[in-house]
Amino acid sequence: MKILIACEESQEVCRAFRELGFEAYSCDLQECSGGKPEWHIVGDAVKEAYSGKYDMMI
């Protein structure tokens, strides 16, 4: 399941979902501070949510 975690630059929630086996991505207007830029999208979370790429958004 592909999950978008909106308004999250720390990647704490993203990491927790990844540890549970989900394909999770954080999204924020800022660069991430969690150390996994490959799991982070810099941009508008609303536009990303409507892209149709995700099964769930938090």
Locations of the language-model features?
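Catalytic phosphate/metal-binding cores of nucleic-acid and nucleotide-processing enzymes, i.e., regions
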Residues: M1-I58
